[in-house]
């Protein structure tokens, strides 16, 4: 998922 991918997690702090 997004939160396991560092760039995605970094871009979605509220979600992750």
Swiss-Prot record:
Site (Important for inhibitory potency on alpha-3-beta-2/CHRNA3-CHRNB2 and alpha-7/CHRNA7 nAChR): 11
Record has DNA-binding as a keyword: no
Record localization: Secreted
Modified residues (Sulfotyrosine): 15
Modified residues (Cysteine amide): 16
Residue pairs linked by disulfide bridges in the UniProt entry: 2-8, 3-16
Site (Important for inhibitory potency on alpha-3-beta-2/CHRNA3-CHRNB2 nAChR): 10
GO molecular function terms noted in the UniProt entry: acetylcholine receptor inhibitor activity; ion channel regulator activity; toxin activity
Impact when changing residue 10 to L: In PnIA(L5R-A10L); 25-fold increase in inhibitory potency on alpha-7/CHRNA7 and small increase in inhibitory potency on alpha-3-beta-2/CHRNA3-CHRNB2
Function: Alpha-conotoxins act on postsynaptic membranes, they bind to the nicotinic acetylcholine receptors (nAChR) and thus inhibit them. This toxin blocks mammalian alpha-3-beta-2/CHRNA3-CHRNB2 (IC(50)=7-68 nM) and alpha-7/CHRNA7 (IC(50)=253 nM) nAChRs. It also shows a high inhibition on alpha-6/alpha-3-beta-2-beta-3 (CHRNA6/CHRNA3-CHRNB2-CHRNB3) (IC(50)=11 nM) and a low inhibition on alpha-6-beta-4/CHRNA4-CHRNB4 (IC(50)>500 nM). It interacts with a hydrophobic pocket between two acetylcholine receptor subunits. In vivo, inhibits Ehrlich carcinoma growth and increase mouse survival.
Family: Belongs to the conotoxin A superfamily.
Comment, domains: The cysteine framework is I (CC-C-C). Alpha4/7 pattern.
Protein name per UniProt: Alpha-conotoxin PnIA
Lineage, opening ranks: Eukaryota, Metazoa, Spiralia, Lophotrochozoa, Mollusca
